[in-house]
């Protein structure tokens, strides 16, 4: 830990191809800037390079990121509507195939203790996702999730219990 407003981390992985990973986050209560860089020490190439800038207020978070060695650009915006509801939107641009994606979503907490949450998201690719989750304790919960690909008429459904 560098200070209250900055964090720096370095990792050296001793594998068949040793890596050196360096990440840092700087900021204050209104903005944060972070980056991550991973080097393959044998081949002397950059295997990972990510950077992110976040602007934060009491009820909103706006984030801009450049990931996968500048091949993925993402912008996201989250707005707290009230204490139990959050809405968000995310736009992505993939440089390699020049494709865009956009999704919007909402999360709502239920009950006096906020142990039940529901999430709904829709994307321009024609997918709709729903998740319901009930926390019994801090680390135990039950989840029901589903996804429907509207343009392919396919769906997925899942149940999970973690104790």
UniProtKB/Swiss-Prot annotation:
Belongs to the eukaryotic mitochondrial porin (TC 1.B.8.1) family. Signal peptide: none annotated. One of its GO terms (molecular function) is voltage-gated monoatomic anion channel activity. It holds the Pfam family Porin_3. This is Putative mitochondrial outer membrane protein porin-like. Coiled coil: none annotated. One of its GO terms (cellular component) is mitochondrial outer membrane.
